[in-house]
From Swiss-Prot:
SUPFAM superfamilies: Dimeric alpha+beta barrel, Winged helix' DNA-binding domain. Pfam families: AsnC_trans_reg (PF01037), HTH_24 (PF13412). InterPro entries: ArsR-like_HTH (IPR011991), AsnC-type_HTH_dom (IPR000485), Dimeric_a/b-barrel (IPR011008), Tscrpt_reg_AsnC-like (IPR019888), Tscrpt_reg_AsnC/Lrp_C (IPR019887), WH-like_DNA-bd_sf (IPR036388), WH_DNA-bd_sf (IPR036390). GO terms for molecular function: sequence-specific DNA binding. It comes from Pyrococcus furiosus (strain ATCC 43587 / DSM 3638 / JCM 8422 / Vc1). GO terms for cellular component: cytosol. PANTHER family: LEUCINE-RESPONSIVE REGULATORY PROTEIN, TRANSCRIPTIONAL REGULATOR AZLB. SMART domains: HTH_ASNC. This is Uncharacterized HTH-type transcriptional regulator PF1734.
């Protein structure tokens, strides 16, 4: 199935406010509520919509530190290392990348002690050769809501 202009408009509205009801979306797009229901169901079935969530301000929840961590790992262990790291509650993103490092991790911490424990735990994972941690001084933009 293909995603058309109406699907993209629905997605744009949901990206802005995932609490919108089918009725509100239908009214904004001037289409039937049933159409909106069917389209959203189709987008879920296709895996385009993977859930509905809220956008949080992590600093207001006490997560003062954002770390970007480059990890050099043994090639045959990369996938296993990524899975182990992805399970940690501090981790928001794990990327398998090209370049100097094999893995890039974005994680949020409430304290330097939490970050220190995390980095040391990463270094103890079998196959991790080295890490390089950068702490964000200011978050200028942090928004994964791209226009569909």
């Amino acid at each position: 199935m293909e995603i058309d202009d109406l699907d993209r408009k629905i997605l744009s509205l949901l990206i802005e406010d995932s609490r919108l009801s089918y009725r509100e979306i239908a009214k904004k797009l001037n289409v039937a509520v049933g159409t909106i229901y069917n389209r959203i169901k189709k987008l879920e079935d296709m895996g385009v919509i993977q859930g509905f969530t809220v956008k949080l301000n992590y600093e207001k929840l006490g997560y003062e530190l954002t770390a970007i961590i480059g990890i050099k790992a043994q090639g045959k262990k990369i996938r296993e290392i990524e899975r182990i790291i992805a399970r940690d509650k501090h981790v928001t993103c794990v990327y398998d990348v090209t370049g100097e490092y094999d893995i890039i991790v974005i994680a949020k911490f409430r304290s330097r002690e939490d970050m220190n424990r995390f980095v040391k735990s990463v270094l103890s994972v079998d196959g991790v050769e080295k890490t390089n941690t950068h702490v964000a001084l200011e978050i200028v933009k942090e928004d994964f809501r791209l226009e569909p």
